[in-house]
Amino acid sequence: MSATKLTRREQRAQAQHFIDTLEGSAFPNSKRIYITGTHPGVRVPMREIQLSPTLIGGSKEQPQYEENEAIPVYDTSGPYGDPQIAINVQQGLAKLRQPWIDARGDTEELTVRSSDYTKARLADDGLDELRFSGVLTPKRAKAGHRVTQLHYARKGIITPEMEFIAIRENMGRERIRSEVLRHQHPGMSFGARLPENITAEFVRDEVAAGRAIIPANINHPESEPMIIGRNFLVKVNANIGNSAVTSSIEEEVEKLVWSTRWGADTVMDLSTGRYIHETREWILRNSPVPIGTVPIYQALEKVNGIAEDLTWEVFRDTLLEQAEQGVDYFTIHAGVLLRYVPMTAKRLTGIVSRGGSIMAKWCLSHHQENFLYQHFREICEICAAYDVSLSLGDGLRPGSIQDANDEAQFAELHTLGELTKIAWEYDVQVMIEGPGHVPMQMIRRNMTEELEHCHEAPFYTLGPLTTDIAPGYDHFTSGIGAAMIGWFGCAMLCYVTPKEHLGLPNKEDVKQGLITYKIAAHAADLAKGHPGAQIRDNAMSKARFEFRWEDQFNLALDPFTARAYHDETLPQESGKVAHFCSMCGPKFCSMKISQEVRDYAAAQTIEVGMADMSENFRARGGEIYLRKEEA
C-alpha cells in the first residue's frame, strides 16, 4: 500500500504524465523479437529473456563458461513492449490487421453511423476536448456476408489471424535446444487435446468446432490476434473502467497499457461513469489486446440508471454503437430467465452479478421474459456483421460459497448452452462465463457441466473464490480456484484484485491481480501438460542452483519485485554473485551444500576410479605397454 494517498487531481495528473511520456520499453535484460509467418504482415512479437553464461570450471584467472540459451516468452504488451516503436496515444496504435480485413473483400465502410447515440455524441461540440483525435471509419459486413473467424474456419479458410495465433501459441520453443530446458513432466489434461506443435490448421479446426474463439472485431484492427480455448494456453482477462465516483479517461488508458505490460490477454472496459463512449474510443484505439464490454451497463446509463426503463431499442442501439467502435466481445446476460429468478430467493447472497440483477429487476417489474433472450437472434445478426464474439454472462452466479452449484446457477448454464447453438447458426463465436464463489471440492463439477451442456464452448470464469473470509486478499482466495479450474479445462480466467468487494482497483491493484492470475494460468498450463510450458521453470531452477541472481530476477514474472526483495537484505553488488541469500546465509544454503556434495561425490568417484586403475596396473605386472593379445 502507498504511504500517501493521492488526491483526485494528483491521480489524473500522474496518469496524464504517464501517457505524455509513454515509450516502448522492454523488461530487464529482455529484447523484443518477431517471428514471421507465410501470410503477408504476419510478424508475431515475443519477449526473449537474455541469460548469462554458467561457470563450469577453469581458474580464477581463466574461468570457463557455458552459454545459456535465451528464453522466449509470450508477450501481450504489443507495441508498448518494443523500444524501437514510437508511441503516440493521441494517434493510437498502428492498424496491424487492416490489410488482412481489406483483402478479404467482404466488408464495406459506413458513410453514416448506425447508432443514434453515436450520431448525437459526434454532433456535440462540447465533447471535442475529450474526443479521440484520430479518425476510424467503421466497417460492417457487406449484405449477405458474415465476417467472423468462425465463418472462415467453417469454410476451411486459414486466415492470417489463425497463422499468427499458431506461431504465438508455440511460444518460440522450437528455438530451445537444451534437453535440460525441454524436459517436461506429463500432464493430466482431463480430455483436452494438446498437440506437440500447434499449427494454423489446428487453430482453424478448433475455431470451426466452437472449442475456441478469436475475438477480433473488424473495427479493432489494432489488436494482435489471440485465441481462447482449453486446448491452448490459459488466458487472463483484466477489468478496468471508470465509475460515477472515480477515475478519468487518462487513468483508464494508463490502466490499459499497464494491464498489457503485466500480461493481460484481454481487457474488459466496465465503465459506468461519465463519458463512457469517449473513454472506450481512447481505449480501443490504443489497445493491442481484445476489448470486451458489458453493454447493459451503458444502456442503463442511457435510461438514467432505472432498470425498468430499459428497452430492446436502447440496448440494440448500444450494441451497434460499441460494435462500430470496435469492441471485440460482449457479455450478454441472456440466460437470466424470469422463471429462474425465484430460484435465488433462498440464497444467502441473492443475485450478485450487476448485469444479472439489472435483468432480473427488469423481468420482475414487467413480468415479461428477458428481452435479451427474446431478441437473441437479432443480437447474433449484429455480432455476425462485425465479428463481435459473445461472452454469455452468468447473471445467476453464486456470490458466496454457500450458494455454490445451486439450482439457479445450473439452470442458467443449461440455457446458455441452448443459446450457444443459436449463436453458432449465425457463425458467431461464443464463450461461456462461470462463477464466482465455489469451494475447492465443488469446482470440477462446474467444468464438467459446462463442457457437457455448452458443447465444449470455451469457459471463462471469475476465479472462482474458494473462501469468503479474506477481503483485501481475494486475489489469493480466487487465484487458488482459478489455478484449479484452469487445470480442469477453463480457457480464460478473469482476474480478481485485492480491492474485490472493497473498491475500484488502482494501478497497483491491477498489477497485483494480474501477477496472481498469470501464476494461476501458468500453473494450470503445467498441470495440463501444455507443450513447452515448463521451459521457463527449468531455466529459473537452473539459474537458482547456479546462483545466477540476475537471471533469476529477469526470468521472474515480476523482475522488479524479485530484485527489490533480494536487495532489501543484500543490496550491494557482491550480493548478486554470492552463493547464498539472506534466508539461510552462507553456511546453511541447501543449494550451496548440494553443489559441495555433488563436487565431493565427483571427486570421490575419480579417486576410487584412480585406485581401481592403480590396482589393475599392478596386477598386470606394472608394464607400461602390453602385448595386443593381453590388452
From Swiss-Prot:
Zn(2+) binds at H437, H501. Substrate binds at N239, M268, Y297, H333, S353, R354, G355, D394, G395, L396, R397, E433, Y460. Its EC number is 4.1.99.17. It holds the Pfam family ThiC-associated. InterPro entries: ThiC, ThiC-associated_dom, ThiC/Bza_core_dom, ThiC/BzaA/B. Homodimer. This is Phosphomethylpyrimidine synthase. Its cofactor is [4Fe-4S] cluster. Belongs to the ThiC family. The keyword Glycosyltransferase does not apply. Pathway: Cofactor biosynthesis; thiamine diphosphate biosynthesis. [4Fe-4S] cluster binds at C581, C584, C589. It catalyses: 5-amino-1-(5-phospho-beta-D-ribosyl)imidazole + S-adenosyl-L-methionine = 4-amino-2-methyl-5-(phosphooxymethyl)pyrimidine + CO + 5'-deoxyadenosine + formate + L-methionine + 3 H(+). The keyword Mitochondrion does not apply. One of its GO terms (molecular function) is zinc ion binding. Catalyzes the synthesis of the hydroxymethylpyrimidine phosphate (HMP-P) moiety of thiamine from aminoimidazole ribotide (AIR) in a radical S-adenosyl-L-methionine (SAM)-dependent reaction. One of its GO terms (cellular component) is cytosol. Keywords: 4Fe-4S, Iron, Iron-sulfur, Lyase, Metal-binding, S-adenosyl-L-methionine, Thiamine biosynthesis, Zinc. One of its GO terms (biological process) is thiamine diphosphate biosynthetic process. Binds 1 [4Fe-4S] cluster per subunit. The cluster is coordinated with 3 cysteines and an exchangeable S-adenosyl-L-methionine.
